[in-house]
A protein has these predicted regions:
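Bacterial N-terminal signal peptides that target proteins for export
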Residues: 2-14
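Aromatic- and Gly/Pro-enriched helix-to-coil junctions and flexible linker segments
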Residues: 23-154
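Bacterial N-terminal signal peptides
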Residues: 12-22
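Compositionally biased, low-complexity segments enriched in small residues
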Residues: 1-4, 20, 33
Length: 154
């Protein structure tokens, strides 16, 4: 009798999660290390008033950033889940989002993951964003908002 060696679905799922995490971590390591004061050089007010709205905006053919980046997973960028019935974050949640998102930003660095990762490859982005290329070009107003924050807008 010949026994077929089959991989368990659980092992396959664990391998996929591991490989997805490894790819994301290598992306995070590919940008320069932020200085100790990186989060203080980014404007919390601009983030709260303009950047968080980008994460909530529904774009044609895509899901909202908040849909994937609030689940407990191995993604580099994480957002606080919205409170039940809420359409935006409260002050405490926004401060936590600011801290978490600041980790994927090097202030003033044009290739920070936050602005490169969701940008279409033809426009200078990369292919590894599991949520697809959210921004077709650098002319997209939401992409320009993210870039403005990364580049130091107040």
């Amino acid at each position: 009798m010949h026994r077929t060696n089959r991989i368990s679905p659980y092992v396959a799922a664990a391998a996929c999660v591991f490989l997805a995490g490894a790819g994301t971590l290598s992306l995070a390591r590919s940008q320069p290390a932020p200085s100790a004061t990186a989060s203080t050089s980014l404007s919390y007010e601009f983030f709260r008033d303009k950047v968080e709205a980008v994460f909530l905006h529904k774009r044609e053919g895509h899901t909202r950033c908040v849909a994937c980046h609030t689940v407990n997973n191995v993604m580099t960028m994480h957002l606080v889940p919205l409170s039940p019935g809420a359409t935006t974050w409260n002050e405490e949640q926004s401060r936590q989002n600011f801290q978490w998102v600041s980790r994927v930003v090097v202030p003033g660095y044009e290739d920070s993951l936050l602005i490169k990762h969701p940008l279409d490859e033809k426009a200078g982005g990369d292919l590894r964003h599991g949520g697809g290329q959210q921004f077709a070009s650098k002319d997209d107003p939401d992409w320009q908002t993210l870039r403005a924050w990364v580049m130091g807008a107040k």
